[in-house]
Regions:
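N-proximal short alpha-helices
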Residues: 1, 5, 24-28, 69
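Generic N-terminal amphipathic, Lys/Arg-enriched alpha-helix
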Residues: 1-16
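A generic structural signal for short, solvent-exposed coil/turn residues
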Residues: 8, 31-33, 101
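Short acidic/polar alpha-helix capping motifs at helix-coil junctions
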Residues: 13-19, 32-38, 56-62, 82-84
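Generic preference for hydrophobic/aromatic residues in regular secondary structure cores
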Residues: 14, 25, 105-107
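Short, well-ordered alpha-helical scaffold segments within catalytic/effector domains
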Residues: 18-25, 68, 93
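N-terminal glycine-rich anion-binding loops that anchor highly charged ligand groups
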Residues: 20-51
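Active-site-proximal beta-alpha core segment in soluble small-molecule metabolic enzymes
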Residues: 42-112
Length: 112
């Protein structure tokens, strides 16, 4: 979408240069290959399936999220390996289990 006047945009919104995004993502993927590691982008800023796919070279690979709402959104789009990057509290475990069962995915946890 091309916008001539930034004041016309509904906020909050994400504004980015797709060419720069693609170059940065390519550089990150190449660096991970050099280090023999897996890229697991944190998608909390973009909250975008399209951007997650650009980051992962159009693959449905591992991602990192900050909310269970984000986890469910990406699970519904076919992402199967999701890291929930904040400490979980017991009352959220039911929803986490629901997401895993409904979308046949794995939501990994970080415990502190």
């Amino acid at each position: 979408m091309k916008i001539n006047n930034l004041e016309e945009l509904e906020t909050p919104c994400l504004i980015l240069d797709k060419n720069i995004l693609e170059k940065n993502c390519l550089r990150a993927r190449q660096r991970c290959i050099q280090l023999n590691t897996i890229l697991r982008p944190h998608i909390k800023t973009s909250k975008s399936i399209e951007i997650a796919k650009i980051a992962l070279d159009q693959e449905i690979g591992p991602i990192t999220v900050s909310t269970l709402q984000e986890a469910e959104y990406f699970a519904s789009a076919g992402f199967k390996d999701i890291l929930y990057a904040v400490s979980i509290i017991p009352r959220k475990l039911t929803r986490l289990n629901f997401i895993q069962q409904k979308y046949n995915c794995l939501v990994r946890l970080v415990l502190d």
